[in-house]
Amino acid sequence: MEPSEGASPGGLVKEVDMPQAALSAPVPVTGTSGQSPMAEEELGIPIPAPGLLQVTERRQPLSSVSSLEVHFDLLDLTELTDMSDQELAEVFADSDDENVASDSHAGLHPLPRAGCLRSPSWTRTRAEQNREKQPFGDPERQPAIVDTILTVERPKED
């Protein structure tokens, strides 16, 4: 090959073709064609051995988080959330409405119903502590249990 105009004086530019698995394009190397790879390494320009650059296995990209389906048990989820938040309670109520609407026939509107959601664990523990202090035959024991369940009224659809 002939030296290119941009090459340094006294050096030749040659293209060394590497295996397709190692490189996708030829790599220009400065040096003379009669030098061995060891001699080129002495000049400060190492030529990688093709065996070290070969790709032996390609992995498929990992799935994105948005494509993963994650299911939560409603009761477990309510234990982790503050159900005193009205907007959050409406979200749970609306999700039940969607399930009922998909099951109902076209033209029929599902009747609104009250849903019961368990209160967060911190309110249950307070009520349970009150129960433990009272004797089992105490008539006030029943209201303590009722306090641990929140009733959520669904808005009527007109």
UniProtKB/Swiss-Prot annotation:
Keyword hit for Cell cycle: no
InterPro entries, alphabetized: Dysbindin
Keywords: Phosphoprotein
PTM-bearing positions, type Phosphoserine: S95, S119
UniProt KW Phosphoprotein keyword: yes
UniProt-annotated stretches for the region Disordered: 1-38, 96-158
GO biological process, one term: regulation of signal transduction
Cellular component, GO, one term: cytoplasm
Basic and acidic residues: compositionally biased ranges: 125-141
A Pfam family matched in the record: Dysbindin
PANTHER family to which the protein is assigned, alphabetical: DYSBINDIN DOMAIN-CONTAINING PROTEIN 1, DYSTROBREVIN BINDING PROTEIN 1 DYSBINDIN
Similarity comment: Belongs to the dysbindin family.
Protein name, UniProt field: Dysbindin domain-containing protein 1
The organism of origin for this protein: Bos taurus (Bovine)
